Amino acid sequence: MLLNSFGSKICGFSLYETSKPNLYRILKLNKKINFIKGDIRDLNSIQTAVNKFKPDIIFHLAAQSLVKDSYIDPHFTISTNAGGSNNILECCRLSKSLKSIVYITSDKCYENVEWIWGYRENDKLGGYDAYSSSKAASENIFSAYLESFLKQKKIGAASARAGNVIGGGDWSKDRIIPDIIRSISSKKKLVIRNPSSTRPWQHVLDPLMGYIILGMKTFRNNDYSGAWNFGPSNDKVFTVKDVVNQISKNLKINKNKFLLKNNKTANFKEARLLKLNCDKANEYLNWKPKLTSTESINLTSDWYKSYFYKKDMFTETQNQIKKYLKKYE
């Protein structure tokens, strides 16, 4: 919808309805954009889509995005995040129309030693789980294609690294805010694991705007190719417990509905501290997050509140985007 608000002609390529409810269906985006159902692990189907649509810019966001699921099915995670991303880059290499690609990975591509400083784009990549290592691998694949092929073809190519984004319309499993919303709907208690963990909470509109700026820059100037971080403001570091309390307050839910529990028996490792240094984007793209952590949580709460009241969610979402874009005027 953000691209649509700029008047872009859009074609989406994705697996179909990976969650229920589904934002694509809620907003009836099938009436607004072209859509091709497909799996990025299938090179031929992506190649066919690219050849048919002939894009000027590709935004690659497809992924298996859950750390927990990477322990359940590491092969699918790696084949999607590394192998599928390789397929996207191969299509870029072969494309005759493409001018730019923005290749979104994750802040978890960094080898996380849980220090207090934000990670910079030139810090060491790596991971201790299939998800994180798949993202580090996809970054290495990106670097290989950039240096070996895309520069020679004068295709602007940038990798973008963001963290835990929040926002209305997310129904993914094992994510704190969607889990809270499902708990409210089902009237069941929810166990909140690791409430003292910190995450770089930011509203999805902030990094998305960064990606669009990056797409415009690389479209016009290949010098913007390379890696870029898009993290939240450092106004306040929120713990999982902080987020639960704020959402409960906004939606007028008794916070005793949620059971806070340090999960010492989990069979997978998830890092507790991770921050990004975004000085590069601040300096060279003039990009800074427009929303504080509190504003991000409130905006997200407002979206779900409107959904519960059965409002026109296309209009509600559009209004949130319009209000956000005014911050760039």
Question: Each predicted region: which residue ranges?
Answer:
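N-terminal Rossmann-like NAD(P)+-binding domain of SDR-like oxidoreductases, especially those catalyzing
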Residues: 1-162, 166, 271, 319-324
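Protein kinase-like catalytic domain
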Residues: 93, 146, 185, 215-219, ...
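Alpha-helical substrate-binding/gating segment
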Residues: 178-190, 201-228, 249
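Residue-level signal for the nucleotide or nucleotide-sugar donor/cofactor binding architecture
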Residues: 41, 72, 80-83, 129, ...
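Amphipathic terminal alpha-helices
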Residues: 8, 293-329
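A short C-terminal helix-loop "cap" of Rossmann-like NAD(P)-dependent dehydrogenase/epimerase domains
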Residues: 29-31, 122, 149-156, 180-192, ...
